[in-house]
Amino acid sequence: MTPELNLKSLGAKTPYIFEYNSQLLEAFPNPNPNLDPLITLECKEFTSLCPITSQPDFGVIFIRYIPKDKMVESKSLKLYLFSYRNHGSFHESCINTILLDLVRLLEPKYLEVYGDFASRGGIAIKPFVNYAIKEYQDFKEKRLLNAK
């Protein structure tokens, strides 16, 4: 028998919200907290708005993390990332906010967010940000040096 996870999004009718909302994120207990898997999540259809021109920006968001006690529920992550659709923010700010929201929710051992945004005016912006608890600082520094 599976434990009660108290998830609101998974298996329910999906109301799509297109205004930034960190409350959409949900987590569940890590079933193997003694292991250190590096989990990769990829959102191939991330969209937000330029805060100056209100033009849409498109990108691929890569989230990698080593969980501690909690893991992100993937449908809630999808809904959360969709909530940026009409949100006006620079690429770098989006990536920083995603990291901060996930760190607040999960309290992971390690987490990184990388955005591969479509070129605009011939320039592609590819922000990277990462976080680590004290025991994973060396890993964080190595990942930062080898960021895409």
From Swiss-Prot:
Pfam families attached here? QueF
Query: Mind listing the UniProt keywords for this protein, alphabetically?
Result: Cytoplasm, NADP, Oxidoreductase, Queuosine biosynthesis
Record flagged with keyword Oxidoreductase: yes
Some GO term, biological process aspect, for this entry: which one?
queuosine biosynthetic process
- Under which pathway is this protein filed? tRNA modification; tRNA-queuosine biosynthesis
Which residues make up the binding site for substrate? 72-74, 91-92
What Gene3D superfamilies does this protein map onto? 3.30.1130.10
* Positions of the catalytic residues: 50, 57
Q: What is its EC number?
A: 1.7.1.13
Q: From the Swiss-Prot or TrEMBL record, what is one GO molecular function term?
A: preQ1 synthase activity
Where in the cell? Cytoplasm
What reaction is this protein's catalytic activity?
Answer: 7-aminomethyl-7-carbaguanine + 2 NADP(+) = 7-cyano-7-deazaguanine + 2 NADPH + 3 H(+)
Organism superkingdom: Bacteria
Q: NCBIfam families from the entry?
A: QueF-II
Q: What protein family does this chain belong to?
A: Belongs to the GTP cyclohydrolase I family. QueF type 1 subfamily.
Q: What does this protein do?
A: Catalyzes the NADPH-dependent reduction of 7-cyano-7-deazaguanine (preQ0) to 7-aminomethyl-7-deazaguanine (preQ1).
Q: What is this protein called?
A: NADPH-dependent 7-cyano-7-deazaguanine reductase
* Source species: Helicobacter pylori (strain ATCC 700392 / 26695)
